């Protein structure tokens, strides 16, 4: 099997995918993450995101439940989030 086929077999689309996002402690972090995800998954609503401070309070963590239709859409969301100035890491 090729690497691409192996990756495709790990996730069955469409699905609800939990994105883990770490970023700056900033009053607009949650809205920035939500707005960025909505560019590629417009059905994502505010109740799909939860945030919490890191243990030392230096970062904010967010989990966003996103309905994704295919790998390309998921990749586009990852790229958009990782390029945002308030985002440090996306898992």
From Swiss-Prot:
It comes from the Bacteria. Gene3D superfamilies: 3.30.70.260. This is UPF0250 protein NGK_1021. It holds the Pfam family DUF493. InterPro entries: UPF0250_YbeD-like, YbeD-like_sf. It comes from Neisseria gonorrhoeae (strain NCCP11945). Belongs to the UPF0250 family. Signal peptide: none annotated.
